[in-house]
Structures are given as structure tokens and as C-alpha cells.
């Protein structure tokens, strides 16, 4: 999709948008970074042949390793479902996210935890990814424009419950 220039392209229907994992809005880089891109483009082009090639089997092996070694607590899954249900029931939401989006976010959460050097998914991981996974899956009611506010409102109570259950578990472990 190219919302700036729709010539020859058409917006996808909502069910087809559900097939994309993330919606990421990118801003232009700052002036200094843009100058650096211009100054180093030949270097990057010349070294592109030296890039390490990753095979399909490498990717599948990494996926298996992450799946086996990065734990997703039941409390994280519960918070995810509760947030989704709140979104679906919110009067500001015309169409909520699908269960498919919940299934798809789980491995993404595991990868983010791995990148952050952990063997478990945290509430912070959920807060980081959820807006990007749900932004294009939730259709707001007419007149409602701020998806992030709606999401924050729907996340508040489940995330507070998650924090309490995590704290309770940590206290029980140290006692």
C-alpha cells in the first residue's frame, strides 16, 4: 500500500491486512544520518557481496531454538487475550483484532526477548510489540482517530494485573 500515491495501487481489505504481522510507520532520517548515507553508499555497495548468506535451514534452526528456549508465561498469554477482548468490546472499536494476530505475536515476542538477551517474554516486550501488531488489525469507529489512546486504555488493567501477578510470583519465589 502506498497512501501517498494511490495510482495503480488499492488499499487492502481488512481481512487481507490481517496477514501482515507488523505495521511500522517510518519517519525520514535526520539530516546528519542522511548525509552519512550519501557519504558511505559506495562502501556499502562494494561490501554487499561479502554479506553472510543465511539459508532456510539456518532460519528454521534458529526458530526452533528460540521456540524451545524462550518461555512465554501463561500470565503474558492471559494479558494478551484480555487486551484483545477489551478492544473488541470497546465502543470506540468497530472491528477488533483476530485470534490469528494473537498467535502470530507469540513468536515475535520470543524473538524480541532473545534480542534483548532474555530467555523469557516480559511485559515490556508485550508493550513494545502490541501497537505494531494491532495497529492495522483494529478498525476504529467513525470519529475516533487515536488508536494508541484506545489501545493504552484497553491495555491498562490487564497490564496492571500482569505486573501484580509477576510481583506476587517473584515475592513467593524469594520467600
Annotate each PLM feature:
Residues 14, 31-32, 56, 74, ...:
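Alpha-helix N-capping/helix-start residues
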Residues 28, 70, 74, 117-120:
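Residues at alpha-helix boundaries and short interhelical turns
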Residues 89-175:
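C-terminal engagement/docking regions of AAA+ P-loop ATPases
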Residues 31, 35-39, 77, 81, ...:
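An amphipathic alpha-helix signature
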Amino acid at each position: 500500500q502506498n497512501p501517498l500515491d494511490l495510482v495503480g495501487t488499492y488499499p487492502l481489505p481488512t481481512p487481507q491486512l490481517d496477514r501482515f504481522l507488523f505495521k511500522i510507520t517510518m519517519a525520514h532520517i535526520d539530516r546528519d544520518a542522511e548525509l552519512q548515507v550519501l557519504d558511505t553508499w559506495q562502501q556499502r555497495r562494494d561490501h554487499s557481496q561479502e554479506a553472510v548468506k543465511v539459508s532456510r535451514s539456518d532460519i528454521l534452526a534458529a526458530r526452533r531454538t528460540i521456540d524451545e528456549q524462550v518461555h512465554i508465561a501463561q500470565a503474558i498469554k492471559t494479558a494478551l487475550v484480555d487486551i484483545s477482548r477489551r478492544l473488541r468490546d470497546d465502543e470506540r472499536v468497530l472491528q477488533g483484532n483476530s485470534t490469528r494476530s494473537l498467535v502470530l505475536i507469540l513468536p515475535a515476542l520470543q524473538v524480541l526477548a532473545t534480542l534483548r538477551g532474555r530467555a523469557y517474554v516480559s511485559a515490556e516486550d508485550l508493550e513494545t510489540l502490541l501497537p505494531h501488531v494491532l495497529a492495522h488489525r483494529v478498525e476504529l469507529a467513525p470519529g475516533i482517530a487515536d488508536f494508541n489512546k484506545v489501545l493504552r486504555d484497553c491495555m491498562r488493567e490487564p497490564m496492571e494485573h500482569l505486573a501484580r501477578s509477576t510481583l506476587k510470583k517473584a515475592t513467593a519465589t524469594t520467600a
